[in-house]
Amino acid sequence: MERSHSELDAVIVSDQLASGFQDSPVLPRIWAGPARALYVGPGLDLSPHLNVATTIAVSLRQPFELRTWAKPGGWSPWRSEVISVIPSETLHHLKGLGPMAFLYLDPLTDRRHPLSRADLLRGLERLRLAGLRIGLDEAFAAFGLRPHCPRDARIARVVREVERRPDAFGRLQDAAALACLSPSRFRARFDAEVGLPFRRYRLWRRMAAVMRTIAAGGSLTEAAHAAGFSSSAHLSSTFKRMFGLTASDLLALGVAIDLSEDNVLSECTHDSQPQVDTARGA
């Protein structure tokens, strides 16, 4: 039986997760806009996971421990960090004590060239000066991150529709048809414009839809269905693979969700350029 939001808040969090919370009694907060996200709160002891979005992990007080998985070689040694960029689709294991910030860099809002170590350290200093009350815009500005929109109007059209209807486009062919491209051509164009395969980008935006439903007071089952998941169990397993904890565990910590406005989609409407593609059947 589906538990209500208030019941979920009363769930006892596992000792492993709670250890980080006890060392950082700051209630977690998530800012979720249409094309970027920020988490500020306890670092927690997360299970290994793969973020769809490139992530900047920032210690607001003491260092955190991080290791990554690669083929061949397996797990790297644990290393102590105060700030680290975790590339998209990188399996990693992070243990943080004390308050942390995680900036999730949606490809549509952030420059793609790598941030230098100097960029990261400047951003770290600005975040620490701002403290725990830093907001979405201020956090991203600390690293000089600027909007990036698809220049191909056909891809921008699909991006807008995914935002409006996150439960749609279960088949890549449907998105390709909206863009007036063949599936193979659409797959290549979307990856080139957005920097992420379509299915993975859609999954990222579905998670944003989950946050919106929960923020509006919906249950996990309602959030799952609104975002196109078959059940709350399906959502829970996917959420844990992406973030290292289940959605119910996150809610049990008393997380606040701020649906900050973000005008990147309207900017994409103006910035995108029509493209002539004579190879639709390619």
Show which residues each predicted segment covers.
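Basic/polar phosphate-binding segments, predominantly the helix-turn-helix DNA-binding elements
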Residues: 173-202, 224-249
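Compact structured core domains
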Residues: 79-171, 180
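…primarily DNA-binding HTH/wHTH and HhH modules…
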Residues: 1-18, 215, 237-282
